[in-house]
Curated annotation (Swiss-Prot):
One of its GO terms (biological process) is translation. Coiled coil: none annotated. It comes from Sulfurisphaera tokodaii (strain DSM 16993 / JCM 10545 / NBRC 100140 / 7). It holds the Pfam family Ribosomal_S17e. PROSITE patterns: RIBOSOMAL_S17E. Gene3D superfamilies: Ribosomal protein S17e-like (1.10.60.20). This is Small ribosomal subunit protein eS17. Belongs to the eukaryotic ribosomal protein eS17 family. GO terms for cellular component: cytosol; ribonucleoprotein complex; ribosome. Keywords: Ribonucleoprotein, Ribosomal protein. InterPro entries: Ribosomal_eS17, Ribosomal_eS17_CS, Ribosomal_eS17_sf.
Amino acid sequence: MGNVYTKDIKRVAMQLYEKFKDQISTDYQANKKIVDAYVDVMSKKVRNRIAGYLTRYAKMQRTQVKNEVEEEYIEGEG
């Protein structure tokens, strides 16, 4: 079964990604440190969920950008 994240976790992760896009990576451990540094989270569980969704969101965004670049390249050849 997949993970279901609350809107709050998604919102915080997306805001972090937009603000610190250059620092966010697809590495979960690095993203945990970023969440610790920039978000005042009371529990470790919430921090980990934000970092996990942030990692997943970063992977999705990078894949989407990569696909767009490939499509532009293919259209340019034709």
